[in-house]
Structure formats: C-alpha cells, structure tokens
UniProtKB/Swiss-Prot annotation:
Pfam families: Na_sulph_symp. GO terms for biological process: L-glutamate transmembrane transport; malate transmembrane transport. Belongs to the SLC13A/DASS transporter (TC 2.A.47) family. DIT1 subfamily. InterPro entries: CitT-rel, SLC13A/DASS. This is Dicarboxylate transporter 2, chloroplastic. The chain crosses the membrane at residues 94-114, 127-147, 166-186, 235-255, 262-282, 307-327, 356-376, 380-400, 415-435, 451-471, 484-504, 538-558. Residues 35-58 are annotated as: Disordered. Expressed in leaves. It is a multi-pass membrane protein. It is found in: Plastid, Chloroplast inner membrane. It comes from Spinacia oleracea (Spinach). Residues 1-22 form a transit peptide. Residues 39-58 have a biased composition (Low complexity).
C-alpha cells in the first residue's frame, strides 16, 4: 500500500570517525584487493527494520561502519545523527482528536445539514455520508488507514445502511487477493536478494557516468516492477540502499552540501522515474488492479487486461523513462558527472554476493511462470489471481518464503482490510445510484459550457491529477475518486476504455508530486538528499512534462491502437 501515514522513513545515522570510513573502500592503491562492505536489507516482524552495511569477508573488517537506520516518519528530512540504539519516544495511542472530529463532521453535515436530492434514497444518502467520512479519514488520518476503514464499515452495518454480507462482500474479490499475493512476491524479491542483484548488474554495465548510472537504475526498476507491485518496497528494499551506498562511496553525504555531488540527482531521478515504471505494467502497482476493478463495476471491461495495459502504456512510458534522467540531468544536474568507480564497486559487490543462489533461481522461475500465466492464462482458463496463487504456492513449497514471511507482511493484510472496505462501499454507491447521479450533475454542467468530449476529458484528467495534493495515498485517491471521475468522463462522452486507462496511468504519475504523495515519496525524501522546496518544484515541473508526454505520445499511440 502506497500510504504515507503507515510508512517509516529512512534517515542516516553514522558512527564513523572520519569521512573515509563512510566509503565502500579506503582510498588506497590496493583497495580493490580488499573486500568492500555492501548493503543488505534486514527485515523482521518488528516495526523497525534496519538497513546495514555488512561485509562478507571473514578476515577483514572496518573499524567504523556506516549504519543506516529506519526512523519514524518525520515532516522534514534531517541530517542530524543519533545513536542507532536510541529508542523513539512512546507514541500516543488512540485516535487523533482534531482529525477525528473533522472526519466525522464531514459525514454528519452531509447527512443532517444538506437536503437529500429527490433522485436518491435515504439509504444511498446515508451511505454517501459514511463514505465521505471514510475518505476524509484517509486524508486526515485520525487512525491508521486500515483501522479507520474498519470503523467505516462498522458504521455502515450498525446504522443498518448495509447488511453485513453486503458490507463485507469485497473481501472475496479476486483483484484484492491478487494485490495481497503480489506483496508476498515483493517480499520474496527482497528476501532472496534477487532484486538487489538485478539492480547491481545494471550499475556494473551502465555506471561509468552519473547519467549512465541513472539509466541503469531506471531500467532495472522497470524490469523488476511487474513482479513487485509496491513502489515503496522497490524504493526502500532495493534502490534507496544502492543509491545511498553509491553516493556515500563518492563522498556525497545526506544533509550537507556534498549531497549535490551525486545523491540528489540519483534520488530525484529514481523518484520521478518510478511512476512511469509503475504505469508500464498492470501488476507494477497495487492501485492499477484496483482501477480496473472499479472500471469493470462501471461497465468498462478490458479483455486480456495484462497484455492490453502493457500495449497501451508501452510507448508513452518508454519515452518518459528515456527522457526523465536526461531532463533532470539538465534541470537538476549533479556536480559529479563521471562515476568510473561505480562499475568496480558493483562488480565487487556481486563478487561478495557470490553466485546466484537456489532460492534466487526459484524466484526467477516462479515469476516467469506467473508473468506467463498473466499474459496467456485467459486462453487456458487460468485467471490472474489463480496464477498468483500458483506462484505463491511454489515459493512456499520450496521454502523461498515461509508462512511467517506472509504473516509478517503487514502491509498486505492491511491492504486487504481497507481495500475491501473501499471497494465494497464504492460498488454499493454505484448500485444505489450515487455515482450515476453525481456524474450526471457534472456532465450537465460541462455540457452547458458547450465542451467537446476531448475538452471535457482534459479538464477532468487535470482535476483528478492535481487534486492529489490533498492526498497522502495513491490507493486512497483511487478508492475515493476514481469511480466518480470515470463516471463523469463517460457521461461527458469520453470513450470508456480511454478514460479508465488515462485515469489509471495518472494515478501512478502523480505519486511524485510531493514528499507525501506516495510511499516511495516518503522513502526517498526521508533519505535526506533533497530539500523540500526542490521536491515540490521538480514534482510540478515533471508532472507537466509527464502529462505532455502521455498526452501527445499516448494520444497518438492510443489512436493507432483504436482505443478511441
């Protein structure tokens, strides 16, 4: 789940006594003959995983090693150091009072202060009030998202707005379970080290210059994206550790002026590229699957969705991925242009990692099986969720994952809880006529302006995109607004498939607007390499550039494909 409210952020804590001790190697003529420490990710069931530099050498050690520690989420990135053993102050339990009052007030005001339209039933109006309070809670976060969603579905049952089976009907939804299983695949990539190995190979092949290094990281993310549906997992589990290790080895440290040598550019480029990687594949982000499910409930059905999604996204996403590192190289340039040591560092890291393990090969084979079934499964009667279930079963049977790994993947179970609540409410809003009534009102307003469907399409897409400044979750945005905006598009005469795909692609692209707009945003900003004003400035500039690329290139490509 790409939600800021539930994410820890990464900050640097060092125990070094000299700047040399923070590098992968000491600057000596014989440094390549020593084992270099490399990054490893340690995950546990505790809420505070740690990232550490470790050395696989049994005969050499560093007297002081850089230590990366996950800290609780802050509003700002800090460069100050603190002991890794310092315990955070105890957090206050229970709901936050002011966000709670505001969230509940939204629904109460609609229910009791706003006259019910004659076209709607009391049940529909009451469900809309509960839904709006639920959505307000997603934005204001009086409680964690899953807890607040549970309160929302409880309210719908207690008030007899929905019967229990109807309120919980979405918990059997195939798409939601596909999302849950995809989180387990992501854990497999991290646990086996396969994702880290893939990214390191691209650093070795393309890392002689800063620009080449950026392209290597961008390409590697695009390759692992279809099997890792969480941009947060990709950012925190694979790419941020690699970027930080490369930056530190080049003397680019977070917090100070040296960060501009390499770290700021790599962080910003990876951050801005991630949205296009997520938009490229249906299974590259959890919200993609939710978008298509909500579209289907409004009558927009796409045959062979995995293939069709990839075909439609391929050209605009490829152009955007190709241009993003180059554009940022001009607009947000690194001080260090050449990184001749990066391939050597990557080669040494691969040497320390050793040969590909059995579990990595199993992971490769399993993902090839799953992706093949996602592409061709419909022809042999295997649905996407069944393909994912088969893949997870293989990983469990062969010991790549154990059941505790699945149980400890809290984001998966949390996603199941609140996705199901939102999908269930959204489907009932459609069944009770709320969505059609709302979209009809907007469509009539647009028609009074004598707008053609392309003009209405542009206005609605822009509104859907930039309203994300009010959200801290991509999936929360989808659950709150996707159905309504899709219905408005359709009512305005926009072809259904075009509107559904464009809204879904935009959902990935606006994840880089701010430091709170997505899970990966919090991870990358929390690393301490970019200033907050730069995040907002470059976020807006790249949003306009991406919108232009997807509108021009995508518009022509979709016309060729016959989507409209």
């Amino acid at each position: 789940m790409e939600s800021l409210a539930l994410l820890p952020t990464l900050s640097l804590s060092t125990t070094t006594t000299t700047s040399k001790a923070t590098a992968f190697l000491r600057s000596s003529t014989t440094s390549l003959h020593h084992r270099r420490p490399h990054l490893s990710l340690s995950l546990s069931s505790t809420p505070k995983p740690t990232l550490t530099f470790s050395s696989h050498s049994h005969s050499h050690s560093l007297s002081s090693k850089p230590l990366l520690a996950l800290k609780p989420l802050n509003a700002t990135a800090s460069s100050s150091s603190s002991p890794a053993t310092t315990s955070p102050p105890p957090t206050k339990s229970g709901a936050k009072l002011i966000p709670l009052i505001l969230s509940v007030s939204v629904g109460l005001l609609l229910r009791f202060a706003v006259p019910k339209p004659a076209e709607l039933t009391p049940q529909a109006w009451q469900l809309l009030a509960i839904f709006l309070s639920t959505v307000a809670g997603l934005v204001l976060s009086p409680l964690p998202v899953g807890a607040w969603a549970f309160l929302g579905v409880t309210a719908s049952v207690v008030t007899k707005t929905l019967p229990f089976p109807t309120a919980f009907c979405a918990f059997t939804n195939e798409v939601i379970w596909l999302i849950v299983i995809s989180f387990f695949f992501a854990r497999g990539f991290v646990k086996t080290g396969l994702g880290d190995r893939i990214a390191t190979y691209f650093v070795k092949w393309l890392g002689k210059s800063t620009l080449g290094l950026s392209y290597g990281l961008t390409i590697s993310e695009a390759l692992v994206a279809p099997a890792m549906p969480s941009t947060t997992a990709r950012a925190g589990g694979i790419f941020l550790p690699i970027i930080k290790s490369l930056s530190i080895s080049s003397g680019s440290l977070p917090g100070g002026e040296s960060r501009k040598k390499l770290g700021t550019y790599l962080i910003m480029t990876q951050f801005q590229s991630a949205g296009n990687s997520s938009a490229l594949f249906l299974t590259a982000a959890a919200q993609n699957l939710l978008c298509l499910k909500l579209a289907e409930e409004l009558g927009v059905k796409i045959a062979s969705p995995w293939v069709f999604w990839l075909k439609a996204a391929s050209l605009p996403a490829f152009v955007a991925l190709l241009l993003t590192p180059l554009i940022l190289y001009k607009l947000y340039p690194p001080e260090l242009k050449d990184t001749p040591e990066a391939p050597a560092l990557a080669a040494e890291k691969l040497k320390n990692m050793g040969p590909v393990t059995k579990n990595e090969w199993v992971m490769v084979g399993t993902m090839l099986l799953a992706v093949s079934l996602w592409v061709f499964g419909e022809k042999i009667g295997v649905s996407s969720v069944v393909a994912a279930m088969l893949g997870l079963s293989v990983l469990l049977l062969l010991g790549v994952l154990d059941w505790n790994d699945c149980l400890n993947e809290k984001s998966a179970w949390d996603t199941l809880a609140w996705f199901a609540v939102l999908v269930g409410m959204a489907s009932q809003l459609t069944n009770l006529g709320i969505v059609s009534w709302m979209s009809g009102c907007v469509a009539r307003s647009l028609k009074t302006m004598n707008l053609s469907w392309p003009a209405a399409f542009g206005i609605l897409q822009a509104a859907y995109f930039f309203v994300h400044y009010l959200f801290a979750s991509q999936t929360g945005h989808v659950g709150a607004l996707y159905s309504a905006f899709l219905a408005m598009n359709i009512a305005s005469g926009v072809p259904g498939v075009l509107a559904a795909l464009a809204l879904a692609y935009n959902t990935n692209l606006f994840g880089a607007l701010t430091h709170y707009s997505s899970g990966q945003a919090a991870v990358y900003y929390g690393a301490g390499y970019v200033d907050l004003p730069d995040v907002f400035k470059m976020g807006f500039i790249m949003a306009v550039i991406n919108a232009t690329i997807w509108t021009v290139v995508g518009g022509v490509w979709w016309k060729i494909l016959g989507i409209y």
